[in-house]
Amino acid sequence: MILLDTNVLSALMRRHPDAAIVAWLDGLPPESVWTTSVTVFEVRFGLELLAAGRRRQRLEEAFAMALEEDLEGRVLPFDQAAAGSAELIAARQRRAGRPVEIRDVQIAGIAAARKATLATRNVRHFEGLGLAVVDPWTA
């Protein structure tokens, strides 16, 4: 299972997505590609902050299409299992003097609870968290 982080999903919403990311994604079984409820929040929040207009409308349509057609509703929630994993990750990182941003630790918790690989360009945000991480830009 691959979880798309916010930056990967956002990159796919561009008018002309990076060919390397598209090729990487096309090489995966569609049913193995998921995202998280935290990522959905981050994208929707970003869209809400945009001024009304054609750009926002196009991005909202691209996001809806990504969720409905590309991911076919494959969105994992931040549930009890994810919260349990996130709590352990956050506490371990805080004790080590390397606190993690709350949304990143929630995404990490979801990935850890599902034993999923996280696809992100921000590999350094997730280093040392005990997750399998892949950067689609360099994969």
Question: What is each of the regions a protein language model found here?
Answer:
Residues S37, D79, W137:
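Residues at the C-termini of beta-strands that transition into short coil/loop
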Residues M1-T35, T39, E48-A66:
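Short, well-structured N-terminal submotif of metal-dependent ribonuclease cores
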Residues F45-A51, E69-L118:
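Active-site neighborhoods of divalent-metal-dependent phosphate/nucleic-acid chemistry enzymes
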Residues L9, V40-V43, A83, F126:
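A generic structural signal for short hydrophobic patches within well-formed alpha-helices
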Residues N7, A20, R44, G84, ...:
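Active-site phosphate/pyrophosphate-handling residues
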